[in-house]
């Protein structure tokens, strides 16, 4: 008993804040990495001077709304960045943070092509004079050699598309919750207009309308009687199965391209009976996929 009491009086263990330093070669995908980390729930500070990193970590730890994950993107755009971050990492060792370094790399050939495609000069190319792009890349690569050697993870983006880089970053710095896809199944009535935010729209007006059955008319598609009536109609279950298969293919493709949010609109005439029942049934099928976070919204329910 005394031992249990002593344990309960101990202060709760505070989980160290995750701190990620993101750096690498210009044109290797630093901005893409920043956007992915933001989508994963990281607080991202872009191009922060190295001298301010330690102070920002302190402020993040002292804040009432303490950050759990902080990422700082730093590159040669900062005039104070000499490529030596050893002293910054040493300062962070005394703080309750779990520090990692991500370095993005790419081949000279790919970097030259990327800069030429966007028609921008390299930050170290001396103003973009002709013949200095390769020199700028070489100078930056030499300047960042120590950082690359100290990195916890080096990703070469030479042969990676944006969605492939996203996947690598998600695998390394995401968690199970943030890797799930957010799917909204929204019922609606066509007479009130199409949902503006829908990625896909399906029309279930081919099913008999419960509105014309007096005992069902007052109820909605959420009631057992209306639901059973709608789902028992010829073609209803086949339609759900076929559309679910189509969504499986679509969701797989969306995931591959890095899309993390999706809205599926299911419409009938007034958004009260058929679309509500079919939305609930479709969401139930989608909800069996552990990689999806599914919610149902009935946009026009109660408008009549």
Curated annotation (Swiss-Prot):
GO molecular function: ATP binding; GTP binding
Binding site for ATP: 24-31
Pfam families per record: PapZ_C, RapZ-like_N
Protein name, UniProt field: Nucleotide-binding protein ROP_69550
InterPro entries noted in UniProt: P-loop_NTPase (IPR027417), RapZ-like (IPR005337), RapZ-like_N (IPR053930), RapZ_C (IPR053931)
Residues at which GTP binds: 75-78
Functional description taken from the UniProt entry: Displays ATPase and GTPase activities.
Alphabetically ordered keywords of this record: ATP-binding, GTP-binding, Nucleotide-binding
Native species: Rhodococcus opacus (strain B4)
Similarity remark: Belongs to the RapZ-like family.
The keyword ATP-binding belongs to this UniProt entry's keyword annotation: yes
